[in-house]
Amino acid sequence: MNTRKLAAYDTSPARIAALARCYSHGMTKHRPPRILVADDDPVSLQFLVTALGELGCAATGVASGKAALAACAQTTLDLLLLDRRMPDLGGATLLRELRRSGCSAPAIATSAELDAPTRAQLAAAGYVDAATKPIGVEQLAALLGSHLPQWFKPQRNSTAGAPTGTFTRAAQSALLEDDAALASVGGDRQTLQALRGLFSQELETMSPRIATLPADELGEWLHRLRASCRYCGTTRLLEAAERLECELKRSRGAARDELLTAVSATVATLQDG
């Protein structure tokens, strides 16, 4: 027996348990891993589902904790990507309910902000990992490689993910930062354009409501908004959202008008770009 070669394999209890899950679920290179993404931010949800598909996974996206429970009841899943903050169920509460329902798939928490205490709380609740949004394609692939031992990264054309051309009108605008946005979506222009279109629709829908939203609802929306801003490269809007969040925490509303102005300007730029 070649002991040197044997030593190269990871035989830790965690690795063995993960392999056992893969085989018990029937996951092989001929059956793509089934992954559930739960996120109430439409831009984050769309990107993660699209990126997982490009990475050879069968991804299902839902926008609430209750929908996640329903999806888990319908099929055997290999991995869960669960937003930490959703209006109905999220974080430790959602994972506890999923475990009660019999779902044993490893769970990764996602959030626009993750400090050390929050990561510790999520780990104590049973999450195997946590990732800060926006989650790029390479980071997503690394998570799959760590938690799905039987996942095989699909071969891609070396130029398939490279940015081609530029967003000529948008690149001249201080409202949009194309390089950072393209990097967050793996250099895929079509994906970025689709996400920006979806984001523009959301902003148009929310714009009339921002001035009258209760502070707690506005705070929850701003939390989701920041992840979308990073995926779409809407720099000015991200800065305005962060300032308004700080103002809300101080019980002031002076930054709300600034956010409304940034929303209107961003919508116009996204539609023109």
Where are these regions (language model features)?
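Conserved acidic segment of CheY-like receiver
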Residues: P32-V43, L48-L52, L80
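Short hydrophobic/Thr-rich beta-strand motif most characteristic of the beta2 strand and flanking loop
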Residues: G56-A63, A71
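As written
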Residues: G91, A123-A130
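Active-site residues of response regulator receiver
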Residues: D83, S111
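The feature encodes the CheY-like receiver
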Residues: P87, D115
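Two-component system phosphorelay core
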Residues: V128-D129, I135-G273
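Acidic catalytic/metal-coordinating carboxylates
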Residues: S64, L89-L94
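Short amphipathic alpha-helix used as the core "switch/output" element in two-component signaling
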Residues: A70, A92-S104
